Curated annotation (Swiss-Prot):
The keyword Hydrolase does not apply. It comes from Stenotrophomonas maltophilia (strain K279a). NCBIfam families: 30S ribosomal protein S12 methylthiotransferase RimO, MiaB/RimO family radical SAM methylthiotransferase. Catalyzes the methylthiolation of an aspartic acid residue of ribosomal protein uS12. Residues 373-441 form the TRAM domain. GO terms for cellular component: cytosol. It catalyses: L-aspartate(89)-[ribosomal protein uS12]-hydrogen + (sulfur carrier)-SH + AH2 + 2 S-adenosyl-L-methionine = 3-methylsulfanyl-L-aspartate(89)-[ribosomal protein uS12]-hydrogen + (sulfur carrier)-H + 5'-deoxyadenosine + L-methionine + A + S-adenosyl-L-homocysteine + 2 H(+). This is Ribosomal protein uS12 methylthiotransferase RimO. It is found in: Cytoplasm. [4Fe-4S] cluster 2 binds at C147, C151, C154. Residues 133-370 form the Radical SAM core domain.
Length: 453
């Protein structure tokens, strides 16, 4: 082995099960090119796998941590005593990281942070953030699979199964790797983002030496620690969604909610098996805007659902007038094989569905145009997606890729810009979809953060 390999010291305490945990960690360390050394003074960092079963084991573990701190100073603690991180940090506040038993990934993340593995061009063919099909500067972050709802127009549960939430620490570590690899925007997706953690009873996990619940608000709080935009998609309108809006007001995550309301008629919503308290929905949208005045609310709707009357469609148009949503997508109802809505009576004729869809989109186009026009004269922080000659295409905080509008920067030949760069743009024009403006000179906007590249 080359003397240039990073060196890890290892102390394993406790029962045979803990010994197996140590073996797994050591195996991973060796597979990544770390040398395992027998003494504190020859180690670049020390891992202590602790026991906490009885008082004497706790004492032995704390003594081992203390010895490693005294003789080396760079110590990562894992194992059973790691389930009581406050006890460890009270005795040794300067340990690098603390994790519980079987949390191999946290140990490896802590080692990587303290002592990055040596780059091997013959082995490191895949970046640690994986292979992505999106541009380098944004990425989708999937937090769960499946869905527990039984919306009558949808067959997702039969295709993808019931809700299965990813552990919050796993999600946060993936997000951290993505940002470290140059991602500037994280787009949180799932079938039902609001239900995150319900299936695991909001289990608590450790990340960066702090406990996080597997829950939407806690996830947002963790993601807000990263130097990137965080955008929430597919948010089912549960009451606890209100908890994340203050984080938007504090600029910790983007003031943006993609929340599918689907309709505004209580009867149609019941037929869809969706929440039906439209008055409360309007109150909530108004309250979100009081808390976070810059919030963008995007939604999707279905027109021509079986049994929809002209009066109920008019209710939907009235809802658009009152809600003044920023971005809206709509679909004419189309039967999906296996959906229970197919069995509902009073199917709406195709020509009526298309006529209603056109009226719906015309109404929303007027609303969107007015809301965009109100931004003329403002300065919007934007993320540059593409540069073509003297025109750059970017997105503001209000614009998700592919589904929302764009910001056309018209002086890209006069101001140095790069794809994936944040830039402040003074808005000069608008239409019903997009904004147009000029990038401000670098001296008048925040410096580009090179650490993200």
């Amino acid at each position: 082995m080359s003397q240039l390999n990073p060196k890890v010291g290892f102390v394993s305490l406790g029962c045979p099960k803990a010994l197996v945990d140590s073996e797994r960690i050591l195996t991973q360390l060796r597979s990544e090119g770390y040398d395992i050394v027998p003494s504190y003074d020859s180690a670049d960092v020390v891992v202590v796998n602790t026991c906490g079963f009885i008082d004497s084991a706790v004492t032995e573990s704390l003594d081992a941590i203390g010895e490693a701190m005294n003789q080396n100073g760079k110590v990562i603690v894992t194992g059973c005593l790691g389930k009581r991180p406050e006890q460890i940090r009270e005795a040794y506040p300067n340990v690098l990281a603390v994790s519980g038993p079987q949390d191999y990934q946290s140990v490896m993340e802590a080692v990587h942070e303290a002592l990055p593995p040596k780059h091997d061009p013959f082995v490191d063919l895949v970046p640690d953030y994986g292979i992505k099909l999106t541009p380098r500067h944004y990425a989708y972050l999937k937090i769960s699979e499946g869905c527990n709802h039984k919306c009558s127009f949808c067959i997702i549960p039969s295709m993808r199964g019931k809700l299965v939430s990813r552990p919050v620490d796993e999600v946060l570590r993936e997000a951290e790797r993505l940002v470290r690899g140059g991602v500037r925007e994280l787009l949180v997706v799932s079938q039902d983002t609001s239900a995150y953690g319900v299936d695991v009873k909001y289990a608590e996990k450790m990340w960066r030496n702090k406990a996080y619940q597997t829950r939407l608000k806690a996830l947002c709080e963790g993601l807000s620690e990263l130097d990137a935009w965080v955008r929430m998609h597919y948010v089912y309108p549960y009451p606890h969604v209100d908890e994340v809006v203050p984080l938007m007001a504090e600029n910790r995550i983007l003031p943006y909610l993609d929340i599918p309301f689907q309709h505004a008629s209580p009867r149609i919503l019941r037929l869809m098996k969706r929440p039906g308290a439209v008055e409360k929905t309007l109150e909530r949208v108004q309250n979100w805007r009081r808390i976070a005045p810059d919030i963008t609310v995007r939604s999707t709707f279905i027109v021509g659902f079986p049994g929809e009357t002209e009066a109920e469609f008019e209710e939907l148009l009235s809802f658009l007038d009152e809600a003044q949503l920023d971005r809206v997508g709509a679909f004419a109802y189309s039967p999906v094989e296996g959906a229970t809505a197919n069995d509902l009576p009073d199917a709406v004729p195709e020509e009526v569905k298309q006529e209603r869809l056109a009226r719906f989109m015309e109404k929303q186009a007027q609303i969107s145009a007015a809301r965009l026009e109100a931004k003329i004269g403002t300065v919007q922080q934007c993320l540059v997606d593409a540069i073509e000659g003297d025109i750059a295409v970017a997105r503001s905080k209000a614009d998700a890729p592919e589904i929302d509008g764009l910001v056309h920067i018209q002086n890209a030949d006069q101001v140095p810009l790069r794809v994936g760069e944040f830039v402040d743009v003074e808005i000069t024009e608008s239409d019903e979809h997009d904004l147009y403006g000029d990038a401000l000179p670098a001296a008048t906007r925040p410096a580009f953060d090179l650490k993200m590249l």
